[in-house]
Amino acid sequence: MIKKETSFIDLKQVKIDDPFFSRVQNVVIHTMLPYQERVLHDEVSGIRKSHVIKNFRIAAGDEKGTYYGRVFQDSDLAKWLEAVAYSLTVEANPELEARADAIIDLIGRAQQPDGYLDTYFIAAEPEHKWQNLTDCHEMYCAGHMTEAGVAYYQATGKTKLLDICCKLCDHIDRRFGREAGKVTGIPGHEEIELALMRLYQATGEERYRKLAAYFIDERGRDPEFFHKEAAARSWSRTDYMDKQPPSYMQNHKPVREQDTVEGHAVRCMYLLTAAVNLAAQNYDEALMAACRKMWDNMVDRRMYITGGIGSTYYGEAFTVDYDLPNDTAYAETCAAVGVCFFAKQMLEADPDARYADILEREIYNGTISGMQLDGTKFFYINQLEANPGMPTNAYGEEEYTPERIGWYDCACCPPNLARLMTSLGSYVWSSSEDTIYSHLFVGGTASFETAGGVKIALTSKYPWNGSVTYTVEPEQAGAEFTLAVRYPGWCHQMQVKVNGIPVSGAVKTDKGYWMIQRSWQPGDTVSCEMEMEPERVYAHPMVRADAGCVALRRGPIIYTFEGVDNGEDLQTLRIPREAKIEVLPYQADLLEGIVALRVTGCRKKTAVNPALYAEDAAQEEVVTLQAIPYYAWCNRGMTHMRVWMQE
């Protein structure tokens, strides 16, 4: 039997003051969110039109016009509203809140009397509601709107959007299920499941938990459900999804019987996020065991070193074990965000540092690589190798442009990244009655109810420096509790001191946390020194794309080589195994502040022999190479880039 062993503390209990993420949050709150707001209102020229606000006005009857955009365009606005809710918790903004309230009023006017809410089917094809669960994303949009409703209520105390979402989910509950008179359908794109669990936890209404359980349990019962639906209907807005195998939508077998991550990577992450939450709520060990197996398969065989998941453009999907191509990697930003959701739920159910290690990898690498440093351009995909001008993908899609752009036709990633970064404080700490867990070394202060009330301040220069200090302020002197500090998987040596006195290594648990149990006095300090030397990292021998190659890592940061620093044709470079890796001083004026690495390498001379093939190996010259953090690449113009270098 399992249960939630710990719970992440509320965003309102955390104040981030961090040398790295304070800048990121400031950019998101003061630049990215306003920029996205203008995009949603179609006020930014030279980019893809959104039309989402106009779609709601048309659906509400406020103006005449024709629906424009993807069938799931509503979700862009929902995710932006959710990000706004978190930003209001981080930093009050009455003007932004008033504009969000006006948008919520608009959403309420668009909602139908029976609770239905989807602007495409309200404005364009009302006769076809709920006829294409495969790819028309009505429940996907409902899920994102529900997440926004919960977040906005928790941030502001206002219930209007929450009430709209309850009415919407009640409508879905009346329609779907195994009871007589209901439809035994499931959504093609998971999202409603995790949203229903959040709605249940916010309202206490059991029907929402039961509906989430129905959608999770029903998936995979009939692997041909979506194909049967396609064959039965005479109408379809698109038949793209109709051709996908059941595994694409994780419908190939019941969730409890699945043991590998399959299909569309984002859908899979959203499903597993909901499944772990449900398993912990229901004490469902069988469901939890399946989630653990899929986590292990993902991390051990199907994840890029940057945290990216999804190896192929076709279906934005997982493929097979160890298939991790670099120049055609998909590694969608939304998928990396989804891994964070999954990891957070796994940590609540089982506070094991291996889940926090992946969460950390994502927030410092695979997620924020999706945003330009100024917050106004975005990557949909996150390749590990870029060769501008080369036809590395056969599809010609804008997602594969090796340069961030201002918006996308399918703009799911920009607001998804915004809601993750504005809610980051809720990923750092969790607590139980007698234990406080420090999962991420993100600086700031946090308040806990543990042991009668505790406040902890964390200070550091992380991720550029491995020194971290906790200052503990219990409300009651002598309060007894355990402070659990993560021992990162990348760290080979970590020293922990309490009030300057070394702590015995015996307190480190097999789940990767230093368990510091004591009677705490106001002003007690815990200082951690983590060895942070640059390291070479090698892929599993079965990863064909990385054979004979090496990547560089320092602390939680994965590094990459850009043409800006090292010239083009990065494939002609190699890093000898004996070459020493030098850590350069922190450069505040480079890429908003980074620590770069320098290493002596070799470059093959290409002009000596012009023959395409020759008997003699190319001559080499010694060169000095510089590596920068992967997340910061492509912020100095379109350029060549490579994470895995020949050795």
Residue ranges and their predicted role:
Residues 19, 212, 291, 353, ...:
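C-terminal beta-rich recognition modules with glycine/proline-rich loops and embedded aromatic residues
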Residues 58-72, 78, 87-190, 194-251:
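Extended ligand-binding groove/face enriched in aromatic
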Residues 1-76, 101-121:
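Low-complexity, Ser/Thr/Pro/Gly-enriched N-terminal "stalk/linker" regions
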Residues 3-6, 60-77, 128-141, 174-189, ...:
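Solvent-exposed loop and edge beta-strand segments that line ligand/cofactor-binding
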Residues 478-499:
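Beta-strand-rich binding/interaction modules
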Residues 21, 81-94, 143-158, 192-205, ...:
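Well-ordered alpha-helical scaffold segments within catalytic/enzyme domains
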Residues 274-301, 324-376, 386-387:
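Catalytic-core region of carbohydrate-active enzymes that cleave or remodel glycosidic bonds
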Residues 497-504, 555:
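Short strand-turn-strand beta-turns centered on an Asx-Gly dipeptide
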